[in-house]
Amino acid sequence: MLSRRKFIKACLGAAGITAFGGLSLRAWAGGAGERTDAPGAAAVPQNGLADRPRYLGLEESGELERRERALWAKMESCDLCPRRCGVNRMAGRMGACSSDQTFIVASAGPHFGEERPLVGRHGSGTIFFSNCNLLCIFCQNYQIAHHGAGRQLTHAQLADIMLTLQRRGCHNINLVTPTHITPHIITALRLAIAQGLNTPMLYNTSGYETLEVMRLLDGVIDIYLPDFKYQDSALAARFSQGAPDYTLHTAAAIKEMHRQVGTLRQVGGVAYRGLLIRHLVLPENLAGTDVFARWVVSELGADTHVNIMGQYSPRFRAREFPPLDRRPTQAEIVQARRWAEAAGLRNFH
């Protein structure tokens, strides 16, 4: 099984233009798309879900089109994320996320290194978008988030990727780092729906979101997969390119996600709706794991699914910021899990 870092490395093996699992971004960049008769392209029927994706009803009612227009309007004086740059990205200006009116895909393919309920037998249909609105100095995927590796695609090509992942039997469409390009995603989603997309949408985010955008995604997203990185605003300001309001906005956004989709729900061990929170253990408890665990139980409930991740590695500029210049010790990771247990979390791993 590939870890996320190895998955990224495999995807970037050809300068960010060949996606893992045989999905070639070079083909989409040239407009060819992926062959529907490619090996492994036979779909695993999605009708085994307990509920069909709610975005289908939004499209049928015309509400999804209204949400799409509202999100595109935000690009004209960009406030898609809490940084609220106010730049007119539709006129080609770059926001803090290093994105204008276009979008870049770094890689796409079935991913088997995500959490087990997201992977199932056929993988999570992962689409890595380039650039980021948070820009952590210890970013584990800095080639994508900071350096913008990948290919600029069209909405039709993105829709084609979604449909190809569905044909390959992926259990969800996993949108990685989607915050700064949500209008593009909704436009592509509507194109894909018209061609038969009916796979759950998974929103894989740093957590640095606004309530306005989260509410526009209500009913569009089936599974939320946010990070909650810090409990100390001063650390967020230091380590995430001046985002002292990270903790405030992320807490509010995650509570809204939980309101929308609730606790993670599964059929046959595969998630089809709900919230799963990621929390990366940092050296010397810089992530505030004890505070985080108590917050989850208090605000969301003890049954909330949480991944306490111990794989931190000092990457990108982390060595300039001790103690982020080292991995957490085994004792620190064990202590983090003890805090989760002591807080009363019942679904953490």
Predicted regions and their residues:
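N-terminal secretory signal peptides and thylakoid transit peptides that target proteins
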Residues: 1-16
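N-terminal [4Fe-4S]-dependent radical SAM core
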Residues: 48-78, 82-128, 143
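Conserved radical SAM core fold
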Residues: 145, 182, 207-210, 228-247, ...
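Non-cysteine beta-strand/loop elements that form the S-adenosyl-L-methionine
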Residues: 218-232, 305-311
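Conserved strand-turn element in the central/C-terminal portion of the radical SAM core barrel
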Residues: 239-243, 253-288, 292-293, 311-312, ...
